[in-house]
Curated annotation (Swiss-Prot):
Function: Required for transport of secretory proteins from the Golgi complex. Catalyzes the transfer of phosphatidylinositol and phosphatidylcholine between membranes in vitro.
Domain CRAL-TRIO intervals: 99-272
UniProt main location, coarse: Golgi
SMART domains: CRAL_TRIO_N (SM01100), SEC14 (SM00516)
UniProt topology in membrane: Peripheral membrane protein
Keyword entries, A-Z: Golgi apparatus, Membrane, Protein transport, Transport
Protein name (Swiss-Prot/TrEMBL): SEC14 cytosolic factor
Organism, as annotated: Candida albicans (strain SC5314 / ATCC MYA-2876) (Yeast)
GO cellular component terms, semicolon-separated: cytosol; Golgi apparatus; Golgi membrane
A GO molecular function held by the record: phosphatidylcholine transporter activity
Transmembrane feature ranges: none
UniProt-listed GO biological process terms: ascospore formation; CDP-choline pathway; Golgi to plasma membrane protein transport; Golgi to vacuole transport; Golgi vesicle budding; negative regulation of phosphatidylcholine biosynthetic process; negative regulation of phosphatidylglycerol biosynthetic process; phosphatidylinositol metabolic process
Length: 301
């Protein structure tokens, strides 16, 4: 593990986001937002917090709570308590998911290269999930630990490398959720895990979703989603794209063909086994790996 300080690692890659019309980002803050950010940091410092107080991290909590300082404080405090209780701060070295090569075939999840905005692209083939078989070799608790492990690997390794390659701060991912082959039974079996996984992402990794594509969505899925849209934040809704079976043209608008696997309509010719375990991206390229080191793996190759 690196002995460099967090400040030194942060200084090794861009901290200013790409230019945007949206305010609340390091590249576009109003005077009022700058003041709110300073007050937020000061109050957290007075509460005894010392870590994760950089501008980008704090702004994610503020954006998630519409720049309401007290709500952002409550969210931050709850997150820090969860990190301590769950062992998040040491999970990258403490947790080993040696069963992953087998689990991955029953619930394929993997990162593969980047989208046009420099985000790491995360694929999840939910339609292939076989929870009954999976629970014979792992547990839901270990699945959730692996999820958190991957979140931490993304935040500490993938995003810094992607930021160096892009030339600006990349703080979100692009997710492609493949629903091909999903059945009522498989969806029902995995709903408990999905619910817990969604809560972790929403409560403890705010503002990490850049783009979210649901492909091969069954008939009626879009209609059902429309019923929930009024209850969702408009910014969140704008990031979600529900696509049917003719998704390739839309997906290629966001992901370069050379980065999108052939199986999803791109030109990246890679086998399923390599997709599951190779973890290809800037975080494996020496040119973009910084003082944090190469992204670790939760299992031995």
């Amino acid at each position: 593990m690196t002995t460099m300080t967090t400040e030194e690692i942060l200084a090794s890659y861009p901290q200013i986001t790409a230019p945007t019309d949206q305010t609340g980002y390091t590249s576009n803050l109003t005077p009022e937002q700058k003041t709110t950010l300073d007050i937020f940091r000061q109050q957290l410092t007075e509460l005894g917090y010392k870590d994760r107080l950089d501008d980008a991290s704090l702004l994610r909590f503020l954006r998630a709570r519409k720049f309401d300082i007290q709500k952002a404080i409550d969210m931050f405090v709850a997150c820090e308590k969860w990190r301590e209780d769950f062992g998040v701060n040491t999970i990258l070295k403490d947790f080993h998911y040696e069963e992953k090569p087998i689990v991955a075939k029953m619930y394929p999840t993997y990162y593969h290269k980047t989208d046009k905005d420099g985000r790491p692209v995360y694929f999840e083939e939910l339609g292939k999930v076989d929870l009954v078989k999976m629970l014979k070799i792992t547990t839901q608790e270990r699945m959730l630990k692996n999820l958190v492990w991957e979140y931490e690997a993304m935040c500490q390794y993938r995003l810094p490398a992607c930021s160096r390659k892009a030339g600006y701060l990349v703080e979100t991912s692009c997710t492609v959720l493949d629903l091909s082959g999903i059945s009522v039974t498989s969806a029902y079996n995995v709903i408990g895990y999905v619910r817990e996984a969604s809560k972790i992402g929403q409560d403890y990794y705010p503002e990490r979703m850049g783009k979210f594509y649901l492909i091969n969505a069954p008939f009626g899925f879009s209609t059902a989603f429309k019923l929930f849209k009024p209850f969702l934040d408009p910014v969140t809704v704008s990031k979600i794209h529900i696509l049917g079976y003719s998704y390739k043209k839309e997906l290629l608008k966001q992901i370069p063909p050379q980065n999108l696997p052939v199986k999803f309509g791109g030109m990246s010719d890679v086998s399923d086994d390599d997709l599951l375990l190779k973890d290809v991206g800037p975080w494996r390229d020496p040119e973009f790996i910084g003082p944090e080191g190469e992204c670790p793996r939760a299992y031995n190759i």
